[in-house]
Amino acid sequence: MFRQLKKNLVATLIAAMTIGQVAPAFADSADTLPDMGTSAGSTLSIGQEMQMGDYYVRQLRGSAPLINDPLLTQYINSLGMRLVSHANSVKTPFHFFLINNDEINAFAFFGGNVVLHSALFRYSDNESQLASVMAHEISHVTQRHLARAMEDQQRSAPLTWVGALGSILLAMASPQAGMAALTGTLAGTRQGMISFTQQNEQEADRIGIQVLQRSGFDPQAMPTFLEKLLDQARYSSRPPEILLTHPLPESRLADARNRANQMRPMVVQSSEDFYLAKARTLGMYNSGRNQLTSDLLDEWAKGNVRQQRAAQYGRALQAMEANKYDEARKTLQPLLAAEPGNAWYLDLATDIDLGQNKANEAINRLKNARDLRTNPVLQLNLANAYLQGGQPQEAANILNRYTFNNKDDSNGWDLLAQAEAALNNRDQELAARAEGYALAGRLDQAISLLSSASSQVKLGSLQQARYDARIDQLRQLQERFKPYTKM
């Protein structure tokens, strides 16, 4: 269903905490490493961190090339929350995002927000390797590294982090300008910041590998993935960009391997969802270049049952992307017959149906899906099928419930706006579009749309009161965000 909702936005958010920062030689034993703790209270409270996180997430949605794919969003959040459930010192909710970027990277910022680059799927051979990157970033959050870095910098140069945060925002709109501003801001205190981030990386590695192991993943995946990064730097004509600016020393790899070797060996099979997510990411994203190669699909076809299914799904996906709908349907059919409730297969079947103007077939299949009431992906698929099939009222009925339960999902608001427009409900269309603008940090535009919606309904009506109350909420949000807009 997501084929109709793809967005190709511009700019990239600078990594506040990256997986490839410089790290010093580590001690031989985990027991000798100091625990730096999680205190950062004198600079930022948890509430302030969450507020800043809310602000930056909205900027991210509005300017970065987010992959707003319901299936992939569901997968990385499910995987991320599995890891979070085995982490200590969790003080904020966690949210995981995927950016369409061919460079290997991941970063964490205020309020439990973790961003992954799509290239991680290309370079992760198995789910444990992907999870190792996420566990590392989760540890940056639980240890409050960014807040503690701000606190440390406030002691030596109080204005430095104000400029740095402003530069991060500039980078969202203009990466080169943002990086230049950030470099200039930190020039006078670079050595102190490097030392601090070295400690952060050391702690995130140590805690991350523990989270990885407790979550049931292979702890050897962390040193294995780090070794892949080093191999690229050694042998590739174009090593990962992250290693050009943040070299990864042998000592970090040696320490990660030493820690993994101290843990109980584990044989961990990647989930089927991992292979399906990898096929989908490589086949539909990565800056428009299809990286779902025949070699990879042939390799999977010779692998275990999960890989074989992913290979067949990948071939169906390739055919659908090439508008070869009959071939896609024929390839997908055995998978769907074996697992009629599988959301990955149902989503692709819906795209095939809609591509052939067979919305009614998609509707009938989705209405009978076992997990329809509990799976947001299937709900969005059905709403979209109703919309494409000329039944906007049915779509609106689903989407009003969906947006009530999933207020931060712009897909729901976008589809609801389309449904209300088709029903000629102008005020409700404007209100839905306003929510999409608000999620993207465009609060002025959101307020303007809600004001227009309010003017179109009966004076003094309950609906007008609702619109006006929402306007007041957004104005209060603007006031809370003012300190960050002035950076």
UniProtKB/Swiss-Prot annotation:
<feature type="repeat" description="TPR 2">
    <location>
        <begin position="344"/>
        <end position="376"/>
    </location>
</feature>
<comment type="subunit">
    <text>Interacts with BamA and LoiP.</text>
</comment>
<keyword id="KW-0802">TPR repeat</keyword>
<keyword id="KW-0482">Metalloprotease</keyword>
<feature type="repeat" description="TPR 1">
    <location>
        <begin position="309"/>
        <end position="342"/>
    </location>
</feature>
<dbReference type="InterPro" id="IPR011990">
    <property type="entry name" value="TPR-like_helical_dom_sf"/>
</dbReference>
<dbReference type="InterPro" id="IPR051156">
    <property type="entry name" value="Mito/Outer_Membr_Metalloprot"/>
</dbReference>
<dbReference type="GO" id="GO:0046872">
    <property type="term" value="F:metal ion binding"/>
</dbReference>
<dbReference type="GO" id="GO:0008270">
    <property type="term" value="F:zinc ion binding"/>
</dbReference>
<keyword id="KW-0479">Metal-binding</keyword>
<feature type="repeat" description="TPR 4">
    <location>
        <begin position="427"/>
        <end position="460"/>
    </location>
</feature>
<dbReference type="Pfam" id="PF14559">
    <property type="entry name" value="TPR_19"/>
</dbReference>
<dbReference type="GO" id="GO:0043165">
    <property type="term" value="P:Gram-negative-bacterium-type cell outer membrane assembly"/>
</dbReference>
<dbReference type="GO" id="GO:0004222">
    <property type="term" value="F:metalloendopeptidase activity"/>
</dbReference>
<comment type="function">
    <text>Functions both as a chaperone and a metalloprotease. Maintains the integrity of the outer membrane by promoting either the assembly or the elimination of outer membrane proteins, depending on their folding state. Promotes disulfide rearrangement of LptD during its biogenesis, and proteolytic degradation of LptD and BamA when their proper assembly is compromised. May facilitate membrane attachment of LoiP under unfavorable conditions.</text>
</comment>
<dbReference type="GO" id="GO:0051603">
    <property type="term" value="P:proteolysis involved in protein catabolic process"/>
</dbReference>
<keyword id="KW-0862">Zinc</keyword>
<dbReference type="GO" id="GO:0016020">
    <property type="term" value="C:membrane"/>
</dbReference>
<dbReference type="InterPro" id="IPR030873">
    <property type="entry name" value="Protease_BepA"/>
</dbReference>
<feature type="repeat" description="TPR 3">
    <location>
        <begin position="377"/>
        <end position="409"/>
    </location>
</feature>
<keyword id="KW-0677">Repeat</keyword>
<dbReference type="GO" id="GO:0030288">
    <property type="term" value="C:outer membrane-bounded periplasmic space"/>
</dbReference>
<feature type="binding site">
    <location>
        <position position="140"/>
    </location>
    <ligand>
        <name>Zn(2+)</name>
    </ligand>
</feature>
<comment type="similarity">
    <text>Belongs to the peptidase M48 family. BepA subfamily.</text>
</comment>
<feature type="signal peptide">
    <location>
        <begin position="1"/>
        <end position="27"/>
    </location>
</feature>
<dbReference type="InterPro" id="IPR001915">
    <property type="entry name" value="Peptidase_M48"/>
</dbReference>
<keyword id="KW-0378">Hydrolase</keyword>
<feature type="binding site">
    <location>
        <position position="201"/>
    </location>
    <ligand>
        <name>Zn(2+)</name>
    </ligand>
</feature>
<dbReference type="GO" id="GO:0061077">
    <property type="term" value="P:chaperone-mediated protein folding"/>
</dbReference>
<protein>
    <recommendedName>
        <fullName>Beta-barrel assembly-enhancing protease</fullName>
        <ecNumber>3.4.-.-</ecNumber>
    </recommendedName>
</protein>
<feature type="active site" description="Proton donor">
    <location>
        <position position="205"/>
    </location>
</feature>
<keyword id="KW-0574">Periplasm</keyword>
<keyword id="KW-0732">Signal</keyword>
<dbReference type="GO" id="GO:0003756">
    <property type="term" value="F:protein disulfide isomerase activity"/>
</dbReference>
<dbReference type="Pfam" id="PF01435">
    <property type="entry name" value="Peptidase_M48"/>
</dbReference>
<feature type="binding site">
    <location>
        <position position="136"/>
    </location>
    <ligand>
        <name>Zn(2+)</name>
    </ligand>
</feature>
<feature type="active site">
    <location>
        <position position="137"/>
    </location>
</feature>
<keyword id="KW-0645">Protease</keyword>
